[in-house]
């Protein structure tokens, strides 16, 4: 889908660039696949802010997406493509031959009327899902499971994809967008193709109000705060902060590695930081 630009009838429209959604469904979502969604306002279970600069925004309904794709050998037809306010990718409503409806992540080049299927071995065409052991090497994939039966976790946002680059001893090797090369069990499911809406990254909201509609509040810089609020705060007039960039809690930011999961380090063949170190 193309990008839409607007005549500069106001400052907010001058900068506005949106994805053209004219081909998407214009009605309500499928009622049987929708749940209520309570806003958190960036607060955790104890009521304290755990993520700053969140709150407000338009009311949403949660669309229940099938990330597992374990309904094997039953063809499904794409009924329509839809916008989903809870993610950057578009979603597709599919109807299985037995009458069941489901939402799946829409890959690029998937159209209304196309047939998709999940199987142990299926055609390599966008929207078809199968275990990694059944795919040809070099296939572009998305919605990849990290553990069998857990549901897809890798490459789910707009325009993302991974590539199957090898198989060995019960594991598949996949290359991620970040440059990371990692192993997952070859029984994990993945869907063929790249995720829809690749132009999402080129959108420009044009004005602060559109950010507020999405539930994002103003992001205040540390150097604009008082010393009590941030290590970069205070000073007479405008300052540069006077130290290496840190978080509000004093931990180094901008480039500091934060990964702490030694149990799964063995599955990472090449770190996403490897090419930067050269």
UniProtKB/Swiss-Prot annotation:
Residue ranges of the region described as Disordered: 222-264
The entry's keywords: Ribonucleoprotein, Ribosomal protein, RNA-binding, rRNA-binding
Keyword set includes Nucleotide-binding: no
PROSITE patterns cross-referenced by the UniProt entry: RIBOSOMAL_L2 (PS00467)
Pfam families tied to this protein: Ribosomal_L2, Ribosomal_L2_C
GO molecular function: rRNA binding; structural constituent of ribosome; transferase activity
GO cellular component: large ribosomal subunit
One of the protein's GO biological processes: cytoplasmic translation
Physiological role: One of the primary rRNA binding proteins. Required for association of the 30S and 50S subunits to form the 70S ribosome, for tRNA binding and peptide bond formation. It has been suggested to have peptidyltransferase activity; this is somewhat controversial. Makes several contacts with the 16S rRNA in the 70S ribosome.
HAMAP family membership: Ribosomal_uL2_B
Subunit structure as annotated in this protein's UniProt entry: Part of the 50S ribosomal subunit. Forms a bridge to the 30S subunit in the 70S ribosome.
Family in the record: Belongs to the universal ribosomal protein uL2 family.
Protein name: Large ribosomal subunit protein uL2
Organism: Phenylobacterium zucineum (strain HLK1)
Lineage: Bacteria, Pseudomonadati, Pseudomonadota, Alphaproteobacteria, Caulobacterales
């Amino acid at each position: 889908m193309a990008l839409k630009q607007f005549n500069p009838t106001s400052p907010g429209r001058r900068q506005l660039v949106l994805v053209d959604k004219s081909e998407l469904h214009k009605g309500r979502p499928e009622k049987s696949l929708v749940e209520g969604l309570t806003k958190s306002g960036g607060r955790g279970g104890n009521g304290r802010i755990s993520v700053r600069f969140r709150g407000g925004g338009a009311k949403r309904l949660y669309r229940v997406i099938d990330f597992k794709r374990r309904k094997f050998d039953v063809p499904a037809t794409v009924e329509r493509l839809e916008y989903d306010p809870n993610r950057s990718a578009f979603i597709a409503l599919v109807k299985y031959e037995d009458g069941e409806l489901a939402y799946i992540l829409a890959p690029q080049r998937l159209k209304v009327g196309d047939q998709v299927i999940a199987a142990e071995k299926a055609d390599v065409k966008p929207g078809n899902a199968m275990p990694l052991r059944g795919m040809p090497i070099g296939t572009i994939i998305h919605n990849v499971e990290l553990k069998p039966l857990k549901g897809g976790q890798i490459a789910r946002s707009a325009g993302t994809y991974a590539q199957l680059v090898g198989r060995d001893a019960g594991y598949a090797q996949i290359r991620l967008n970040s440059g990371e090369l990692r192993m997952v069990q070859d029984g994990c499911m993945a869907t063929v193709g790249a995720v829809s809406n690749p132009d999402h990254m080129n959108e420009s909201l044009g004005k602060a109000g559109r950010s507020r509609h999405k539930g994002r509040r103003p992001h205040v810089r540390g150097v604009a705060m008082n010393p009590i609020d941030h290590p970069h705060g205070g000073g007479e007039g405008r300052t540069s902060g006077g130290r290496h960039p840190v978080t509000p809690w004093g931990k180094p930011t901008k480039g500091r590695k934060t990964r702490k999961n030694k149990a799964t380090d063995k599955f990472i063949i090449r770190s996403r930081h490897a090419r930067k170190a050269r």
